[in-house]
Amino acid sequence: IKKIIYKPGGASNVAQNLSALGSNVTLLGITGDDNELRELIKVLRHTDIKFDPVKDLSIRTTLKSRIIGNDQQLMRLDHEDRNKSDMQGELLKRVIKYAKNSDLIILSDYDKGSVKFIAADIISFANKNNIKVIIDPKGTDYSMYKNAYMVKPNELEFSMIMGKIKNKKDMIAKGKKLKKDLQLDTLLLTLGKNGMVLFSKDSVL
């Protein structure tokens, strides 16, 4: 091994991008209390992000390793404890605490057990306080995202929920249905190299 580089992933990557654009960002999540957490703290020290994790001593901080050789990925190793934490209640309290002074909440759901159990409560609180909630979803059940401001699936995630996209007309019909079913203000469907489609209140762009 010639070099090991630690980079923020998941919600941490979203937070870093927003911070780089000048936003005032607070990053929350459930972590272990281990070397991986300490490495993440080191990386985030170089940003203006306020990081206040809920530490669960019974789990490991998620670490996704990429083994690179000759400028290409040779292997991926994931170290994580999916759906093993019972600290979601504490995470919800912390989200509400910081949300009171926020304009926007972004939920990066990687289907690891932190977000899905509290998403509906976060959305309910946010709507009562005129705070927008944007969700980057995972999994095959979006019911807990109902009444969010925006849900942003990619093409694969969208197809898992609505079925394979046959053509543009079919995609638009399915997008409108998902937006209506979840009572969203906006649905943003990302299509990789083919761009994205925005389903808003009055139009599809």
Regions found by a protein language model. Name each.
Residues 19-26, 100-104, 128, 182:
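Short, surface-exposed connector motifs at secondary-structure boundaries
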Residues 18, 65, 105-108, 154, ...:
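Conserved structural-core and active-site-/substrate-pathway-adjacent residues in large, well-folded domains
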Residues 102-114:
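Short acidic, glycine-rich surface-loop motifs adjacent to enzyme active sites
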Residues 112-205:
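Conserved phosphate/ATP/ADP-binding segment of small-molecule kinases
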Residues 1-4, 48, 69, 79, ...:
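RNA-binding accessory domains that recognize and position tRNA/RNA substrates
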Residues 26-29, 52, 104-106, 134, ...:
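A structural signal for isolated positions on well-ordered beta-strands in alpha/beta enzyme cores
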Residues 53-59, 66-101:
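Conserved phosphate-binding/catalytic loop of the ribokinase/pfkB sugar-kinase fold
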Residues 1-63:
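Substrate-binding N-lobe of the ribokinase-like
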